[in-house]
From Swiss-Prot:
Zinc finger regions, C2HC pre-PHD-type: 42-78
Protein name as catalogued: PHD finger protein 11
A GO cellular component annotation in the UniProt record: nucleus
Record's keyword annotation contains S-adenosyl-L-methionine: no
Major localisation: nucleus
Subunit structure: Interacts with BRCA1 and RELA.
Length: 337
């Protein structure tokens, strides 16, 4: 068979391949930082219970971590490593901070689906609801975002307060991203040592109406106590008391970790102190802790007494040694003369 020159379609395919190869050479490869994932590279969000293709995805190749942009932005304890710039669509997430948030989420169960990894908490300080971001969406939680300052908050449907100081308030079910309606180039997220809180610690307190009469308030508290008592009885009957107290212990452990963090804010100390010390449940605990303080004082005084005796012994030894050396020097002088 005679060898024929390349046909027109084959030439076209060759040109297309060359153009595609050149385009791939231009696109920067991931270098261990979070980057918007390409469509052909499947990445699973580390903060979601399942892979949902409805948010910008960042990933760190060196750590094998991927997370949706919204899961990062609305996670309660996560910070960005640079000041927010409204004119720049890129986000700045510190890899170590993301790893720490993933670890924190392993202890938190989602209010909606019951699975671990729920790092998005209701911003009302007295509310203990935690979600995965998309579970919060399914539970009709309300998103509050301020594009000028880069503040992102989530309130559960029960505690959503339209009278707040954030300009953008909308249900999570109505949140969409422009990244899927237009072509976007791969974007990088940089990493630096400068971290900035996104303002989640400035929680908004939803105050109950003060128009209720005192009698109604007492009746309400009594009814609330009856409901809670019935809840505990049903937990006991269902064999779920261990699970309930496991959740309580997990919460206390998280509070301890929060206090041990070097970046703990003054508002966090105030919030945790109020929650712990205003609860009658811990009155006996505080009394016992006072005894522990007294015991620590006693042990410290005992160590101080022992140190004093040790210092006196060393000083006496030093004086004896000096006297011995002086006597030896005098004897040597007498012999030489």
């Amino acid at each position: 068979m005679d060898t024929a020159g390349p046909s027109a379609p084959e030439s076209t395919r060759g040109a297309s391949w060359s153009e595609a190869q050149a385009a791939r050479d231009i696109v920067p490869l991931p270098t261990g930082v979070f980057q918007v994932a390409e469509r052909l590279q499947k990445r699973i969000c580390a903060l979601c219970p399942k892979d949902l293709e409805c948010s910008v995805l960042y990933f760190a190749q060196s750590e094998n971590i991927a997370a949706h942009e919204n899961c990062l932005l609305y996670s309660s304890a996560l910070v960005e490593c640079e000041d927010y710039d409204p004119s720049n669509n890129d986000r700045n997430f510190d890899v170590e901070s993301v790893k720490k948030e993933i670890k924190r989420g392993r202890k938190l169960k989602c209010t909606f689906c019951g699975k671990k990894g729920a790092t998005v908490g209701c911003d009302l300080k007295s509310c203990f609801k935690n979600y995965h971001f998309f579970c919060a969406k399914n539970d009709h939680a309300v998103l509050q975002a301020d594009g000028r300052t880069g503040i992102y908050k989530v309130f559960c449907q029960q505690h959503a307060d339209p009278q707040n100081d954030l300009p953008s308030v909308k249900p999570l079910s109505g949140v969409f991203h422009s990244h899927y309606s237009e072509q976007t180039k791969p974007r990088h997220a940089c990493f630096s040592g400068v971290k900035r809180k996104r303002g989640r610690s400035k929680r908004h307190h939803v105050q109950p109406p003060e128009r209720m009469a005192l009698k109604k308030e007492k009746d309400g508290r009594h009814t609330d106590a009856i409901v809670k008592a019935a809840f505990l009885k049903k937990c006991k009957e269902a064999g779920l008391l261990d699970a309930l107290f496991e959740e309580i212990l997990d919460k206390l452990h998280l509070i301890q970790e929060r206090l041990m963090d070097e970046t703990t804010a003054e508002s966090d100390y105030e919030e945790i102190g109020t929650s712990l010390f205003d609860c009658r449940l811990f009155e006996d605990t505080l009394v016992n802790f006072q005894a522990a303080i007294e015991n620590q004082i006693h042990q410290s005084e005992e160590r101080r007494r022992q140190l004093k005796e040790e210092i006196e012994l060393l000083q006496d030894l030093k004086q004896t040694l000096c006297s011995g050396l002086q006597s030896s020097s005098t004897s040597d002088s007498s012999l030489s003369s």
